[in-house]
């Protein structure tokens, strides 16, 4: 499973990139708004840091405007993937953009049937939201499992991006369920690095070495 970072914060992306694990970045209007910068400026800078898929989301709610915005965003860099919300107008836009060779990531997926429709419309990626489903009492990982099984059964090439990831367990569960990608906040990536036994082991190695050589 590939690791993406879910943020528009350039410093977080830069730090995570240095770990050598990033295959891409996902952004959304809320994340861009937090940065207080022009979306094109932010996306251009992100593309200069990470050589992988960079999802940039349209703001429009009607097909024609989604397509127009998508075309403009796609011009920024060859790695741009256009993020489209799951809705009737969104599916229409995905079909048009896909016919032009522009990759799309259909977001706000909360059911396997939504994922199926997005895939058949031509989406390159679908993004089921784990955390938000957990919030309403539905185990988010179940949708990832169902989508992965359905896509495998029918030979669908659309990749699954586990989104709304809240903790390391979401990442582990996604990997075991067959998700192709997990897009992860920076703080969760840092949590994945840590384990108390690793820290204790490092401390013990240093203590033993220093004791042996009177350091």
Curated annotation (Swiss-Prot):
GO cellular component: cytoplasm
GO molecular function, a single term: aldehyde-lyase activity
Record carries keyword Membrane: no
Catalysis: reaction(s): D-sedoheptulose 7-phosphate + D-glyceraldehyde 3-phosphate = D-erythrose 4-phosphate + beta-D-fructose 6-phosphate
Location of this chain's protein in the cell: Cytoplasm
Active site: 83
Gene Ontology biological process: carbohydrate metabolic process; pentose-phosphate shunt
EC number in record: 2.2.1.2
Pfam families xrefs: TAL_FSA
Entry-linked SUPFAM superfamilies: Aldolase (SSF51569)
Keywords noted in UniProt: Cytoplasm, Pentose shunt, Schiff base, Transferase
Pathway: Carbohydrate degradation; pentose phosphate pathway; D-glyceraldehyde 3-phosphate and beta-D-fructose 6-phosphate from D-ribose 5-phosphate and D-xylulose 5-phosphate (non-oxidative stage): step 2/3
UniProt keyword annotation of Kinase present: no
PANTHER family per UniProt: TRANSALDOLASE
Known function: Transaldolase is important for the balance of metabolites in the pentose-phosphate pathway.
Family: Belongs to the transaldolase family. Type 3B subfamily.
Protein name (record): Probable transaldolase
């Amino acid at each position: 499973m590939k690791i993406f970072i879910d943020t528009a914060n350039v410093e977080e992306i830069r730090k995570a990139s240095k770990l050598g694990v990033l295959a891409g970045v996902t952004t959304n209007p809320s994340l861009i708004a937090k940065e207080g910068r022009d979306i094109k400026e932010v996306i251009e800078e992100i593309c200069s840091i990470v050589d992988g898929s960079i999802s940039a989301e349209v703001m429009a709610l009607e097909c024609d405007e989604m397509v127009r915005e998508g075309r403009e965003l796609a011009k920024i860099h060859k790695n741009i993937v256009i993020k489209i919300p799951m809705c009737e107008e969104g599916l229409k836009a995905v079909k048009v953009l896909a016919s032009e060779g522009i990759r799309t990531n259909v977001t706000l997926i909360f059911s396997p049937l939504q994922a199926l429709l997005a895939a058949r419309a031509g989406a390159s990626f679908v993004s089921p939201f784990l955390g938000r489903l957990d919030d309403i009492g539905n185990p988010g990982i179940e949708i990832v499992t169902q989508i992965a099984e359905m896509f495998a059964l029918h030979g669908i090439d659309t990749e699954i991006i586990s989104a709304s990831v809240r903790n390391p367990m979401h990442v582990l569960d996604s990997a075991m369920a067959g998700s192709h990608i997990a897009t992860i906040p920076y703080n969760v990536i840092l949590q994945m690095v840590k384990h108390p036994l690793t820290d204790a082991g490092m401390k013990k190695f240093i203590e033993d070495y220093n004791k042996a050589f009177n350091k």
